[in-house]
Regions:
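Short, compact, well-ordered microdomains
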Residues: 54-85
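Extended non-catalytic interaction/regulatory regions in multidomain proteins
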Residues: 1-62
Length: 85
């Protein structure tokens, strides 16, 4: 599948990866929500309920088990080997 199809798949709750990725590396969708302000900076921008709103994003579960924001490189944008897992 291409990247557009992959985005639709993860927005429906699936995990996705490139066929060439190894280990436990995959992408998933994180919907917009909010979190409790913990730092002074976050507290300076929190809403009335003490939370900071964030926008939807794609997260990547890395081989080391940690999660990060995903920004697609050129090779991923034009790939046709995306698959759901």
């Amino acid at each position: 599948m291409n990247i557009t199809e992959m985005i639709e798949a993860i927005k429906s709750g699936k995990k996705a990866r490139r066929a060439c990725w190894n280990g436990d590396k995959f992408l998933y969708y994180v919907p917009a929500a909010s979190y409790i302000a913990m730092t002074d900076v976050a507290k300076s921008i929190m809403d009335e309920s003490g939370k900071v709103k964030y926008k939807e994003y794609i997260a990547i579960h890395c081989k080391d088990g940690e999660v990060d924001f995903y920004t697609a490189p050129q090779c991923d944008l034009f790939a046709n080997d995306w698959q759901t897992i």
